[in-house]
Amino acid sequence: MRVRHFLQFKDLSLAELEYLFERTRWIKDKFKRYERYWPLEDRTLAMIFEKPSTRTRMSFEAGMHQLGGAAIYLYTRDSQLGRGESVEDAAQVISRMCDVIMVRTFEQDIIQRFAGSSRVPVINGLTNEYHPCQILADVYTYIEQRGPIRGRTVAWIGDSNNVCNTWLQAAEIFDFKLNVSTPPGYEVENERMNSRAECFTDPMAAAKGAHLVTTDVWTSMGFESENEARKRDFQDWQVDAEMMRAARKDALFMHCLPAHRGEEVAAAVIDGPQSVVWEEAENRLHTQKALLEFLLLGKIK
């Protein structure tokens, strides 16, 4: 079987993503009924972290265990990668000792180079450019809660970061409308825009009539020196009750977490009845289990 990687959302086709969601439903049902499912027994996942994480580590490590396999945590500072070993050499060695690799790092180029030298599937656990595993869970969560996402409207409010970039790819694949509103100076790069996306200078206009409103922190990891400036620049881009009223009455709210209540989202929203952030976070576990199964075993008949 050809080695497949998941480095950005569009690495998988619509048909493959829909298949993953079918498997997610089945695997999640097994989990909820406490039924053992060990398709990856004796398989090993290597998890390489340059950026720290809670949800990414927990979901991959627990997920691999629940599929019957094992997970090894590697922090770059504690390995030869942190002492100058080339990405290519590390990929050659690590991929000969495990069955699948998840990398969470800063630059997309690093994970591309790693995959280029790996003998096994490589998964993007997050880079500055993309966060495909997050949007896998987000799209699945919307479908689980509200049905097909095709033809719906998603409002992205805030920074044009890795999560936003991945929503842009998802909109094109799943054929939904993406309204993007960012402060001046934080706009989406022109080359990332597509026919399913529209930019708004007014966040309320972006949220109007949306089926889903979603956001992320104003200051992503690696941009901490800009924190005070960003707080000033983003103050009108908080998702609050008024913004949710502009969306549809049955609109959902999502956030990839961790969240800063009182900044990018009001406490009344993230802790309110339209919020599905906890379901969204849990679904990282289930969608990634389906992804691991697919990358290692292909389609299960």
Residues covered by each model-derived region:
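Structural/interface elements that position substrates and couple domains in central-metabolism enzymes
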Residues: M1-K301
